[in-house]
């Protein structure tokens, strides 16, 4: 990056106007001034008395390289000649009380490996990208009418080396990306990778928003990781936290000794739930810092999306003893989304929001917040409560499985089976399932079948694909040894087949956000806890029939209404022996019966497996073919003979 300095108009703009390339002004930039090579340092510290740059190059002497205050509103700058890359540094800030505090650079592009906390001078330009084809293809697609299966991942605990050390960005590219491609995931969502001091914050309590964490390597190493993802056709989404930040002494908290990036009002400054500080989203300098940061990750790291963390915490704050909406946050989120989509109209901006705030995914010009996706937390909570209930009692909470369809089209939803649900004593998805060993696996297969056939894009946390038995342990890697056990191998095979089926079946994603894409066949069979529905694609004849049985009872010749009087094939049955099931499948082509049922034109009689999902597809034949004419005649003959009987 080339520094933009000595431009008073541009510096003043940072305080009063939109300045979305503030990373070009602030931070440490290699520069040539008056023919001399060195580094230009620029920082915002509005209430500092004095400021200097310190590091190994001056033996951390705050009196040697004092900075100049270049705007009345508190921008400080200094050019230091003959400093090179990889030098470490901090700002020594003299507060209004005369105390000297050391702070890392808010705009630093790299930092020391924890537990050290200094910033590192590094020019991140120069990586040669190879993902033009990825972006060319992405522009031709509508994000809403494509399959989306997201693999949520914590970089430090997916897999570790035998000695317990972490894989680097480049090593993870070799290990993880082929694995994801083999499992047919379309995107990876990585828990925050901004620099953060505490491993167990999972990255959600950051100190260096412009610095990809040095735990796993350098900025160019992470660029390589993203580049490789794109080569394999996998999009990269980052968790991003613009609502609050950690209070470690070297970070943003009380940056110049007074509230700078956080609110001055003590009522709303502190985030008491997480022990962090809330960003002052009404302050122009803070908005420019955050929105520039989003665009920085897009520009320099070719990121495809953000999952914006804790939106509910931003939208509402507790003021004067009661919860109120935060209009600063509302305005900020709208401005953020407008800026992002002006840069890339196909970018993924996902709100992690558990509230009923209206129009989260509506455009700002329609009064919305401007996101294009929202996590469906209500679906997740209802479905998991239903699955955790003993099967014989599920009929009493039947509505938990049907309620989501009443609001499924109010937003562009992603269905999340996320990290939050498999940690802190909540158990793994597999262990949430009631019953014996076999029943747990059967019900998890059933849950995944329902998950992939319900309207909405999909997100699954790592380990769920093979039935991780223990809940997530963030200091350890996944239990890869489970592949030694037959049922886990079967689960893994089932998951790969299910997600492959999802990706090649347009009815399961083409009309995710249209009422036309879903129709109940039977939503009211609570006594048997069986649900059946139709998923539809753009083409009228592109349909799938889904039947889910949430009890252990097997039903023979169970009647299911179907929209067309024709033949149907069972294209997936979670009870197949190959998946660890009992083998109650429908091998033969199913002949529909012309008698209407479930308000449908016809019906089929099928075997309903225990704790199973069955997916049927109409048999398609070329119009006017002899084979088709013969099948129609056979169907008519069967219908006639039944009427005669």
Curated annotation (Swiss-Prot):
UniProt keyword Transferase, yes or no: yes
Pathway terms, separated by semicolons: Glycan biosynthesis; glycogen biosynthesis
Pfam families from the UniProt entry: Alpha-amylase (PF00128), Alpha-amylase_C (PF02806), CBM_48 (PF02922)
E.C. numbers: 2.4.1.18
GO CC, any one term: cytosol
Ranges of biased composition (kind: Basic and acidic residues): 626-635
GO BP, one annotated term: glycogen biosynthetic process
Swiss-Prot/TrEMBL catalytic activity: Transfers a segment of a (1->4)-alpha-D-glucan chain to a primary hydroxy group in a similar glucan chain
Keyword flag Protease: no
Positions of region (Disordered): 621-645
GO molecular function: 1,4-alpha-glucan branching enzyme activity; cation binding; hydrolase activity, hydrolyzing O-glycosyl compounds
Catalytic residues identified in the record: 309 (nucleophile), 352 (proton donor)
InterPro entries linked: A-amylase/branching_C (IPR006048), Branching_enzy (IPR037439), GlgB (IPR006407), GlgB_N_E_set_prok (IPR044143), Glyco_hydro_13_cat_dom (IPR006047), Glyco_hydro_13_N (IPR004193), Glyco_hydro_b (IPR013780), Glycoside_hydrolase_SF (IPR017853)
Family the entry assigns: Belongs to the glycosyl hydrolase 13 family. GlgB subfamily.
Protein's job: Catalyzes the formation of the alpha-1,6-glucosidic linkages in glycogen by scission of a 1,4-alpha-linked oligosaccharide from growing alpha-1,4-glucan chains and the subsequent attachment of the oligosaccharide to the alpha-1,6 position.
Protein name: 1,4-alpha-glucan branching enzyme GlgB
Organism: Bacillus cytotoxicus (strain DSM 22905 / CIP 110041 / 391-98 / NVH 391-98)
């Amino acid at each position: 990056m080339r520094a933009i300095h000595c431009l008073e108009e541009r510096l003043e703009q940072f305080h009063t106007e939109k300045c979305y390339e503030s990373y070009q002004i602030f931070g440490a930039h290699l520069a040539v001034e008056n023919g001399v090579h060195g580094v230009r340092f620029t920082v915002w510290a509005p209430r500092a008395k004095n400021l200097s740059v310190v590091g190994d190059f001056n033996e951390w002497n705050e009196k040697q390289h004092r900075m100049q205050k270049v705007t009345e509103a508190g921008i400080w700058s200094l050019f230091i000649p003959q400093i090179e890359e990889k030098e470490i540094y901090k700002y020594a800030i003299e507060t209004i009380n005369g105390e000297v505090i050391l702070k890392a650079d808010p705009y630093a592009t790299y930092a020391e490996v924890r537990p050290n906390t200094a910033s590192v001078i590094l020019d991140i330009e120069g990586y040669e990208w190879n993902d033009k084809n990825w972006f060319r293809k992405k522009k031709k697609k509508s994000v809403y009418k494509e399959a989306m299966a997201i693999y949520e991942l914590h970089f430090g605990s997916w897999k570790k080396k035998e000695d317990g050390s972490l894989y680097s960005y480049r090593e993870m590219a070799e290990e993880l990306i082929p694995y994801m491609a083999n499992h047919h995931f379309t995107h990876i969502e990585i828990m925050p990778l901004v620099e953060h001091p505490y491993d167990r914050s999972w990255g959600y309590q950051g100190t260096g928003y412009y610095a990809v964490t040095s735990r796993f390597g350098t900025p160019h190493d992470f660029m390589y990781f993203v580049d490789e993802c794109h080569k394999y056709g996998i999009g990269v989404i980052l968790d991003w936290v613009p609502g609050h930040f950690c209070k470690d002494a070297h970070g943003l908290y009380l940056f110049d000794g007074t509230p700078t990036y956080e609110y001055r009002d003590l009522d709303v400054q502190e985030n008491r739930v997480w022990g962090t500080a809330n960003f002052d989203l009404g302050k122009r300098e803070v908005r420019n810092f955050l929105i520039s940061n989003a665009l920085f990750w897009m520009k320099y790291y070719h990121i495809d999306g953000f999952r914006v963390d804790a939106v509910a915490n931003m939208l509402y704050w507790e003021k004067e003893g009661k919860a109120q909406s935060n209009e600063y946050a509302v305005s900020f989120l709208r401005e953020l989304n407008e800026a992002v989509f002006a840069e890339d109209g196909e970018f993924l901006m996902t709100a992690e929001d558990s509230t009923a705030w209206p129009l989260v995914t509506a455009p700002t010009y329609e009064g919305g917040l401007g996101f294009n996706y929202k996590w469906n937390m209500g679906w997740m909570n209802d479905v998991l409560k239903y699955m955790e209930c003993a099967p014989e009692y599920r009929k009493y909470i039947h509505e938990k499985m049907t309620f989501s369809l009443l609001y499924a089209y109010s937003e562009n939803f992603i269905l999340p089976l996320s990290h939050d649900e498999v940690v802190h004593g909540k158990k793994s998805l597999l262990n949430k399932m009631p019953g014996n060993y076999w029943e747990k696996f059967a019900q998890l297969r059933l849950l995944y079948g329902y998950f992939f056939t319900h309207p909405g894009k999909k997100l699954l946390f790592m380990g769920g694909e093979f039935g991780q038995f223990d809940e997530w342990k963030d200091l350890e890697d996944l239990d890869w040894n489970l592949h030694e056990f037959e049922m886990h191998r079967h689960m893994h095979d089932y998951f790969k087949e299910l997600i492959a089926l999802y990706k090649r079946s347009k009815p399961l994603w083409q009309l995710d956000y249209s009422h036309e894409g879903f129709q109940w066949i039977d939503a009211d069979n609570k006594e048997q806890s069986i649900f059946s529905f139709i998923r539809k694609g753009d083409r009228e004849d592109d349909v799938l029939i889904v039947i889910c049985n949430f009890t252990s009872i097997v039903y023979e010749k169970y009647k299911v209404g179907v929209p067309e009087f024709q033949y149907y094939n069972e294209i997936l049955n979670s009870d197949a022996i190959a998946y660890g099931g009992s083998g109650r499948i429908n091998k033969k082509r199913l002949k529909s019966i012309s008698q209407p049922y479930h308000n449908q034109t016809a019906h089929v009689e099928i075997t309903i497996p225990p704790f199973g999902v069955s997916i049927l597809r109409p048999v398609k034949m070329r119009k006017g073919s002899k084979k088709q004419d013969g099948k129609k005649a056979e169907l008519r003959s069967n219908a006639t003979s039944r009427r005669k009987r």
